[in-house]
Amino acid sequence: MTIPATGRIVRNGSGQDIVIERTFRAPIADVWESIVDPERMNRWVGTWSGDAGTGKRVSFTMTAEEGATPEEVLIHGCDAPKRLDVESFQGETSWRMKLDLSESDGITTLVFSQNVEVSDEGASSYGPGWEYYLDRLVATHEGTSFASWDDYYPAQVPFWEEELRKAGTRESS
C-alpha cells in the first residue's frame, strides 16, 4: 500500500521549507506534550535527554530507526503550547525545524516545517520521512497501528521531486 504525500515545498526568504500539516481530535496541550515529553515522543519518533530550554542544547535519538545515533539539537524557541523551533546537527549539516500548533473547536492543527537546502541531494527523502513520522504521531493519538516505512519511501519521492522542481530547486528529469 502506498500512502499519498500531503506536504508541499514553500519558498521563504532564505530558501525553501518542507511544510506538512496534521490534525488531531485532541486538545492542543495534549498534542504539545506528544512533541516535547521524551516518553511520549518515544512512541512515534525518538527521545531526548538534557536540560531543555530556549538557547540550550539537548541530545536527541530517533528510536524508530535501527542504528540511529544521538544528534545535538539546539532549541531556538519554545512558546508552549504553540511553537517549538529547533535546529538539529549531524556533523557539519544542520536542519532548522519548526512545529506550530493551533486549536479550534477541540481540533488541533500541527504545521511542521523544515528548511531544505537547494544543493541537498537527499531533500526528496526528507518529505517522505516527515510524512511517515507525523503519521506515526497521529496514530499514537488515534490508537491505530503504524503504516510501514515502505508505504512512504520510495513511493513518495516523485511527488517530493516535483515539489522541489516547482519551488525552483530541481530541474525536470
Predicted regions and their residues:
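Short beta-edge strand/loop motif at the mouth of beta-sheet-based domains
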Residues: 17-20, 26, 38-74, 79-83, ...
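Hydrophobic pocket/interface hotspot
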Residues: 31, 41, 58, 75, ...
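Short, surface-exposed coil-to-beta transition loops
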Residues: 19, 68-72, 93-98, 125
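Residue-level recognition of conserved beta-strand positions in structured domain cores
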Residues: 62, 88, 112-114
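Hydrophobic ligand-binding cavity/cleft-lining segments
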Residues: 1-48, 173
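Terminal "cap-and-tail" regions of soluble proteins that handle hydrophobic small molecules
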Residues: 1-11, 107-173
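Charge-dense, helix-prone N-terminal extensions
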Residues: 3-4, 70, 74, 104-105
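A short, structured loop/turn motif at beta-sheet edges
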Residues: 28-29, 76-81, 101-109
